């Protein structure tokens, strides 16, 4: 079964953030987001779930450093 892939704009809409926020979180948190043959990011449902968790933790006041520790 093939995994559903989402473009960054679709993933950002699902998480209700701007695309630059997803890229920032990827960089700051060391997240491994797959890329296609052209180097474009694509996201899975698991990636979106992870971003929703990150957003929830940010809204609760956690800093990215603490979130990174929780994720790794």
Role assignments for model-derived ranges:
Residues 1-72:
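Basic helix-turn-helix/winged-helix DNA-binding cores
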């Amino acid at each position: 079964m093939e995994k559903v892939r989402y473009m960054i704009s679709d993933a950002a809409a699902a998480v209700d953030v701007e695309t630059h926020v997803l890229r920032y979180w990827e960089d700051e948190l060391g997240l491994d987001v797959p890329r296609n043959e052209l180097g474009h990011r694509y996201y899975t449902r698991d990636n979106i779930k992870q971003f929703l968790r990150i957003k929830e933790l940010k809204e609760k006041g956690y800093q990215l450093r603490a979130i990174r520790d929780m994720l790794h």
